[in-house]
Regions:
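Pyridoxal 5′-phosphate
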Residues: 1-162
Length: 162
């Protein structure tokens, strides 16, 4: 479905707020039902959990080469499809350094990553869904870990945000 502003000239066509379009609300129940019909939600959940476990099994050891503590922290309510991994100390300490790492991973490694900070410690949130494949996480190890390693070596937690 095209945007309500698709027929407008540039730049006006981009002034339309997609949040005012209720198409998502109208179609969500059909999408949910179709995924159940095609694959089944249990199969999707199992795939996501298995894939996230695989991702953690290859990303955690790579992160552990950069730090003296385990990359897998104890969490109260672990989510099978979204494991949390500890980043090396000092890389992400606040919102600015969180955005800096996220931006560097995007610009230099061409990956999008869930980076968060809690009590001055940075974490990587692995997220897996039906559309993800093992190669997504293998590419993160290949391209994303060197960016994190570079930041760990430099000790700099801040870089210019884009």
């Amino acid at each position: 479905i095209d945007s309500w502003g698709a027929t407008l000239d540039y730049p006006e066509r981009f002034d339309q707020q997609g949040t005012n379009d209720v198409t998502g609300f109208l179609s969500a129940s059909y999408g949910i039902a179709e995924l159940e019909r095609l694959f089944g939600w249990q199969r999707i959940r199992d795939h996501a959990a298995d894939l996230a476990a695989y991702a953690a099994s290859i990303i955690a050891p790579a992160l552990e080469t950069l730090q003296d503590v385990p990359a897998r922290p104890h969490v109260g309510m672990a989510q099978p499809a979204q494991p949390l991994l500890r980043l090396p100390d000092g890389i992400v300490t606040d919102g600015a350094s969180q955005r800096a790492l996220k931006n560097r991973l995007s610009a230099e490694a061409d990956v999008e990553a869930g980076i968060m900070v809690w009590r001055g410690q940075g974490f990587l949130r692995i997220s897996a869904h039906a559309y993800n494949v093992a190669a997504d996480y293998e590419q993160f190890v290949e391209r994303g870990i060197p960016v994190i390693a570079s930041m760990a070596r430099s000790g700099a937690s801040h870089s210019p945000a884009r």
